[in-house]
Every structure is written in C-alpha cells, then in structure tokens.
Amino acid sequence: MLVLKTTDQEFSTRFQSLVSDRREATVDVSGTVRDILAHVKAHGDAAVQEYTSRFDHYSPHSHHLSAAFIAEQAAKCSAEVKAAIELAAERISSFHQKQLPQDIGYTDTVGVKLGLNWVALSQVGIYVPGGRASYPSSVLMNALPAKIAGVERIVMTVPMPHGEINPAVLAAAQVAGVTEIYSIGGAQAVGALAYGTETITPVDKIVGPGNAYVAEAKRQVFGTVGIDSIAGPSEILVVADRQNNPEWIAWDLLSQAEHDPSAQSILITDSESFAQQVIGAVEQILTTLPTTKVASSSWQNHGAVIIVRDLAESIPLLNQLAPEHVELCVDNPQLLASQIKCAGSLFLGRYTPEAIGDYLGGPNHVLPTSRSARFASGLSVYDFLKRITYLECNQAALQAIGQSAVTLAETEGLPAHAGSVAVRLQGLNDM
C-alpha cells in the first residue's frame, strides 16, 4: 500500500507511477481466445458444448434454460431478496427512463428538411459472469437499459459451473423481462453471441463484464458486433476530510478491494492523522472480513493514500487518475464535483457509500475503468440506440445549395459526385 504526500520532493514522480500502474491481466490470453472463437465459429453448438464441459464441468442436453427451470430457481430466493431486486429494478428503470432522447426534425431557411431519428438495436447479448462474480445486480444494470431503449430481443448467457447457478441471477432476469437465457460462459459464450450457432441466433451488440478471457473475446469480435467496453479491475477513489468516521471510509475502500486482487482503492485526504486512522481501520477490518484474501491482496499491492495540503489540491490528481468510482465525503460536495472532468460516477456526501450505486441508487454500475473515464461514460440507454439522420431537398432547396455541392465535389476530384447533383440542376433549368 502506497502513502504519498504532495509536499514530498518526489511526489510527482511517484504519483505518475501510480497513474500509469497497469493492473490488467499480465498473461496473454489472446491466442487461446482466438482459437476458441474460431472453433465456435466453425463448429457452433458442438464447440460450445465441448468448452462448457471442459471449463465448467457441465454437459446439459440443452444450454437453453426453460421457463420452468428459471421459475423454479428464482422461487428459491427469499422474499427479502426478491423485494430488494424489485426495488433495485424500479429505481434503475426510473433513472434510465429519463435518458430517452427525442428525435430532431426541422426545415432550414432554404427549405431543406433535416432530422435525426433514434432507433433501438434489434438484438443484444448480455454476458453475466458466474462463480465469484455472479451478481443479480449486473443483470438489472445491463438488461433494463436495453429494455427501456426498446431492444426487441435480449439474450443472456451465464455460466453454470458444475450445473449450479445463483437463484438471484435468474430472479433478476425474471424481473428484467429476460427470457432467452443460455448456460454458457467464457470466450465461447461471446463467440456464440457474435457468430451464432445452430441454436443461438447472433446478436448485434454484446455487453456485460467478465474475466480476462471474456474481455479479450469481446475485443476480438468487435466489428462483427458492437461491444460496450473492455472492463478492467474495479476502482474507487475517496476524497475525505477529518470530519468523517475513519471506519466508514475504511469499509468504502474495501468495498472495491474485495472484488479482485487487481482492484484499486485510493484515499485522498488533507489530514495525515485521519489517513493513519483509516489505514488502521482497514487493517482491523481485514482481520475478520470473509473476503480478506482478495481484499488484502488488492489493498497491499494497489491501494494508496494521498495526503494533500487542502482538498482543492485533490481535483487535478483525481482528474489524472480518472477513476471508476469517486466518493466526495465532505460538506458541500457539489463544490468539488463541479470541477471533476474525469470519473465514471460520483457519490456525493458522507451518507452515499458507493455500494448504494452498485445495487439500487439508479445510475448504472457498469462504468469505465483503467483511466478510460477520460473519454468514456457508464452504460446507459444510449448504448442500445442508434442515430439515423435524414435530409430532404425540394426543387427550390436543391437549386439554392446544389451548385456549392458541385464545386466541392470537383475540388475533391470526384466527378460522379458532382454529376449526380449537376444533372438534377440541369434538369430543373430545362423545365
């Protein structure tokens, strides 16, 4: 765990090292993934079955989950879990419903009609991780924006190691209205969604997080299909003053550290004594935390505490780090928030732990990682929509602007472009 002070002579060098820290998988899986994708593309269901048997030790007659099986598994959830899923779905839906954009259409001063129509994607694949990362919240965060956008066909893949699945995942799928679900995972699931098999019709876009093999598979099928992003390890940056309870902040830092040994948790504070209290609280919690093996590895190898002269000094540092999650645990957090240009999502004030956003705050928890918040945003309704623009010229409009189009086409050395306009202008002149 790294402790930095902005007053230290070597701060700039050490901070830049932190900024450039690459926490993605160091093992190159591209060759293995390329082989899996090629095999799935060539052999379809047989290849999917082969890899599922090898990696998940599961060989069902069909990977398609029946409505009866989904209902049976979902019914295993307690009433409390079902109610929590329904509340989360309600809040996520409400926030994303407000994102729906309006079409644009107008006629300009020369009579040209111009416009832009928003059109939903036809079919989308949602990858839901299995094993340790089998999260019902991921189902809601990926499926509900697609449903609200108007996607007609939503396909979900989720691995079932040894034939087992978290019932809450299927309960979330029920609530989100996802009915086409296949018990496959890994690069083979991405290949099946992208290329199709005898039983799985290919989709237009694939969204959802996964391990290094899933991430690489999404990278390789991009172009054949669209993808949301290449997800890296989780990140949280907490800006906190000494008025906070250090134990609260320690729990916040560990909330991301427990995701992955490569996750990163950073505290920025203007109080050295408070920083030490938080470090002590983290170490104390780790002695009893059930996920301590993962969280300890993350905290020791990638955690950081940065002590600044004042909290205003945190802003340029934060914008360079461009973290996935940012907590502003201060009074009047909007003052700092208004200066933040590079972050996946903000959690404002002392009573908004990032975990609220993970589950049921409303905004999406699928967020840019690995400093991609410099240029990317979290998943939203817009990820499931396309924009189609249109133009319509009447005779007068074409006569008003056509000759300039001819001039530009001739300047670019494209005579057929020029001719397609010129013949119409000539025809109008001959009328």
Swiss-Prot record:
Keywords: Amino-acid biosynthesis, Histidine biosynthesis, Metal-binding, NAD, Oxidoreductase, Zinc
Enzyme class: oxidoreductase
CC cofactor: Zn(2+)
Ranges that cross the membrane: none
Any single Pfam family the record assigns to this protein: Histidinol_dh
Classification via NCBIfam families: hisD
Protein name, as recorded: Histidinol dehydrogenase 1
Organism this protein belongs to: Trichormus variabilis (strain ATCC 29413 / PCC 7937) (Anabaena variabilis)
Gene (UniProt): hisD1
